Amino acid sequence: MKHGNYSLATMNVCSNTTKDPLTLMAMWGSMKGYNPEQGFSFEGPEKRLEVILRCTLETHVDGLRSLDDSVWSGVVGSLNAQIVSRESNEYINSYVLTESSLFVMKNRIILITCGTTTLLNSIPNILEAISAVRGELEWVSFMHKNYSFPWMQKGPHTSLADEFATLKQHFPTGKPYIFGPVDSDHYFLFCYDDIIRPCSSEDDTQLSMTMYGLDKEQTKHWFSDRFISTSAETAAIRAATHLDRVVDGTWTLHDLQFEPCGYSINAIRDEEYQTMHITPEDHCSFASYETNSRAANYSDRMKKVLGVFRPQRFTVIVFLDPESPVGKAYNEGKGIGVEPEYYPEYNLLHRTTNEFAPGYVAMKINYVRTAAVEETVTAVGGAEAGAEGGPD
């Protein structure tokens, strides 16, 4: 979430770096909002890399958590970010970064970075870490929503083609997917799967939300003339914005208010985590939320998050394993809290569901605030009426 002074030189290279169709696909969702008069805009939507290792008899008893923080500083440094703060419990090491978050568990790494970080450049360091603890690579997923300002990205993130080529170089049997319409809000997902099935348990879940057009009465709280780390001051920010309703006192948290703007928070509770990242500038306001919290229905949690940011539009993506509480509810035909009936103030724009063997489900849904839809319809209707009633 580091908001600093960036060169705008890359803003004029759009036409020179968009020749292959996959690059254009990555751009279509956001070019409609491009305003060259606006100047610098921060890339809020994050890249996400998750790597899971298989523990064997030779694997260190503490797995990846046995490694010193200097290892993770090297991983983070390879993608042009730094560790700002750290918290831990019995199961998770949590790191707030200058560009989002890192979570390290015994058998898993979750690395989430925003801006123009080069996340895929961290793969060699991560594979070295797995080798150091004598683990075996079991699962890799790389995911990002379509970038808001893709012409600002650096290699290998300048196109989906380059990202795919880099991933295939490291994980030749991995497969790419696109969730959602390529000319609107969509996700690129790459998965490498070497899980030995049937395995003892597949009960993971992941809920992610990306939100745009945040309420100005809320975003005003995430501007500052200095950096502020976890303290009474950041607690006051959480209280004023009602973030403390999402991350209550049962969680161990650490957060950071950036200068001149931006905010990040990580929270851990036993084996669960939550993370949020906020870009508050009005012309590119954005917030993201992610958790692996176990629930059979996500509506309460999602409503609390939406209550904080009050976005004009949002996308929710859910990954669920068949043995998770939400996975069992889904497979029994029950609502899991992401369906339209839970959010009457929003209209569903698009829904995509992919089912992977054995019962692993990925679901993505795009919503837009009802008032925004009505305003668009009214404006179009007025324009048509004006055209019909023009001078003879």
Curated annotation (Swiss-Prot):
Keyword annotations from UniProtKB, A to Z: Autocatalytic cleavage, Decarboxylase, Lyase, Polyamine biosynthesis, Pyruvate, S-adenosyl-L-methionine, Schiff base, Spermidine biosynthesis, Zymogen
Site (Cleavage (non-hydrolytic)): E99, S100
Annotated catalytic residues: E43, E46, S100, C114, S264, H277
GO process annotations (BP): spermidine biosynthetic process; spermine biosynthetic process
Modified residues (Pyruvic acid (Ser)): S100
EC primary class: lyase
GO cellular component: cytosol
GO molecular function, one term: adenosylmethionine decarboxylase activity
Keyword Lyase appears in the UniProt entry: yes
Reaction equations catalysed: S-adenosyl-L-methionine + H(+) = S-adenosyl 3-(methylsulfanyl)propylamine + CO2
Record PTM: Is synthesized initially as an inactive proenzyme. Formation of the active enzyme involves a self-maturation process in which the active site pyruvoyl group is generated from an internal serine residue via an autocatalytic post-translational modification. Two non-identical subunits are generated from the proenzyme in this reaction, and the pyruvate is formed at the N-terminus of the alpha chain, which is derived from the carboxyl end of the proenzyme.
Name recorded for this polypeptide: S-adenosylmethionine decarboxylase proenzyme
Taxonomic lineage of the native organism: Eukaryota, Discoba, Euglenozoa, Kinetoplastea, Metakinetoplastina
